[in-house]
Amino acid sequence: MIVLFLLIAAVFVGLHWYVWRRLVRDTTARGSAPRRIGTVALVVLPGLTLLAVRDDLPGIPFRLEGVVDWPGFLWLAVFLYVVLALVAGEAVRPLLLRALARRDVKRAEPVTAPPRTGAAPAPADDAPAPALLARRVFVSRVVGGSAAAVALGTVGYGTAGLLRGPQIKRLTVPLAKLPRSAHGFRIAVVSDIHLSPLLGRDFAQHVVDTINSTQPDLIAVVGDLVDGSVENLSTAVAPLAQLRARHGSYFVTGNHEYFHDARRWVGVVRDLGLHPLENARTELPGFDLAGVNDVRGESEGQGPDFARALGDRDPARASVLLAHQPIVIDEAVRHGVDLQLSGHTHGGQLWPGNLLFGLTNPTVAGLDRYGDTQLYVSRGAGAWGPPVRVGAPSDITVIELASGQA
């Protein structure tokens, strides 16, 4: 663990040095105000990021955490795209330098040069040092400015998209065992709301209003509701009491609940009128609905128990499983689940995060089939860390179950 920490720290510091070199040192004069300002910014901003990644900062009132979290997490997103853009710019940099050098040589050539009899041609000198230096500074400013503009534009777009709220997706999923009487049953799936100092009560209210507007038969809240303690976020989650569905609202824990006393949060959710499925199931018209605790709960003796949630049931009935992480799909297949509903991945949240999540999750987003079991993974409604989504817009999915007997 110490080795991993040191490796991450070295990469973090090294990449910030690279950004400082390309954006500050290579584009400003030594001792100038822009260089001093840029240097200070590239010390303060990563410091705020390190503070932001810690939940419930000791000694800082919860309402003030957002003052740290907003710039800290936004810088983390900007930093990601600045690095990517600068790395891409390394390929452009030598091309620009050569093009400018050729242009300067052509400008320096005399229009007419009458030959001198008996005079030896003057040796060709390299470009004067001042001219070469000027070209390098110009190219550094073009590449650095472009990288900064791309990063800021990308993060600005991704932040605005998240704050507008999740999109509504609609998907029809056929289940062979579903009776005709349950054909068209609609489940509103929402995951990864991540209420926090950044996304508070207003965001929760918007999510609730969006869900209710779909008029679902059932609501499934598939984990990672909060990023904070009950004391700090009880007001933020209050709008969930307004969720309305004909067959009720159900909840399973995500890994983030276990960072903040999952047992207490389950109690809060129950008081709000949702039905926690803690390794349990309930019979609904036409199918069984089961839920398991998140695998993170294993460290506290509260891990998933598939035998308890899915054992001793009628295998002729269709079954839907709520499980926060897609990685439990093998257990779902083993227990004959027809449809598993999950979240956790955020669809990658920040491109190219989808590629990284694909290394550790069977499905990053959308619907897949594993044997006789279908797995749907929501991209989630909120965001963890940077309040930004790029290439993975947030969603609330309305799944309409279709009977194979219809």
List each model region and its residues:
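Soluble catalytic domains of enzymes that build or remodel membrane lipids, polysaccharides, and related
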Residues: 167-406
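Non-catalytic terminal accessory segments
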Residues: 1-163
